[in-house]
């Protein structure tokens, strides 16, 4: 279960980790009041459970309380990567000298707990691992022994911190381990952790993920279980679809988890970016196809819809009728690329071609076409 940034920072603060002064606002007026208490320049951060919110306009600045109210009104009126903004964290603007990356996580592939340390703060961990492996330090933690002070010394040296800040690093890393242990967290991340202009270490951003299986031990969070679903994921769950939201622009609808994952891999292979995982299941009815297609057609991020169906117990003619009805009911005119193969394929193909859709028999051809359309629409 993902915690909101303000919740993660509250835990960090209670464990002695320095965080910026701030407060939560549910309205623009509350944002102004919080900004007045802080005084001076502030940063307003949309509390959403998606990544890269800064790039999506979810982090804005204000020079005074009146401007903070205006900026908050703007934030509350928008969606950040598909999520409606209902809470804003208003914080003092920190004068940053240097940014770092610091996390404590469970490396499941190697079955170990590790600190990940990098001088490249603000960079996603996936990008660090892939592009800058020499800028990433791994410090293994034996769960029997736990955190030891030498770990913070290794981290401080790697980051090039002045020696007067080594005690701060020790306190932060020790607290991170205690948070993981006490909250059953599988991720405690500060990105960035910064050295301020006044030579202090502060966690400017914080992320904590709690193991779902331990929620019975954390009543304060258990009540909110499931809230990490995006709006689209919540709708899909109510409709009974297997759906996961991603960051791409090619909507994907298939029957069967294996075919869906294979289609996503093909999209990535040909240079596209999947917007989602959506498995309509075997034997899907016209109504089920219609609701799934409507979900993706109405998704703001989806530029083109790719449908890949292998008809066994799923009948291609039912799929075709569902797609046609979805377009008619939503009135959304987005490119749709369709691959049909199997039961009642000829009927389904005829229905779709009568409506002007091109239907492919080979998945490769359909995927290439969808990627081409998405790229052209991005130019």
UniProtKB/Swiss-Prot annotation:
Chain positions recorded as ATP binding sites: 45, 91, 94, 99
EC number, UniProt record: 6.2.1.5
Domain annotation ATP-grasp: ranges: 9-235
GO molecular function: ATP binding; magnesium ion binding; succinate-CoA ligase (ADP-forming) activity; succinate-CoA ligase (GDP-forming) activity
Annotated binding of substrate, by residue: 255, 312-314
Cofactor(s) required for function per UniProt: Mg(2+)
Signal peptide annotation: none
Record field: catalytic activity: succinate + ATP + CoA = succinyl-CoA + ADP + phosphate; GTP + succinate + CoA = succinyl-CoA + GDP + phosphate
Swiss-Prot/TrEMBL GO biological process terms: succinyl-CoA metabolic process; tricarboxylic acid cycle
Binding site for Mg(2+): 191, 205
Keywords: ATP-binding, Ligase, Magnesium, Metal-binding, Nucleotide-binding, Tricarboxylic acid cycle
Gene3D superfamilies for this protein: ATP-grasp fold, A domain, ATP-grasp fold, B domain, Succinyl-CoA synthetase domains
Record pathway: Carbohydrate metabolism; tricarboxylic acid cycle; succinate from succinyl-CoA (ligase route): step 1/1
Record GO cellular component, one term: succinate-CoA ligase complex
UniProt cofactor note: Binds 1 Mg(2+) ion per subunit.
Coiled-coil residue windows: none
Role of this protein: Succinyl-CoA synthetase functions in the citric acid cycle (TCA), coupling the hydrolysis of succinyl-CoA to the synthesis of either ATP or GTP and thus represents the only step of substrate-level phosphorylation in the TCA. The beta subunit provides nucleotide specificity of the enzyme and binds the substrate succinate, while the binding sites for coenzyme A and phosphate are found in the alpha subunit.
Protein family according to the UniProt entry: Belongs to the succinate/malate CoA ligase beta subunit family.
Assembly and interaction partners: Heterotetramer of two alpha and two beta subunits.
Protein's name according to its UniProt entry: Succinate--CoA ligase [ADP-forming] subunit beta
Gene: sucC
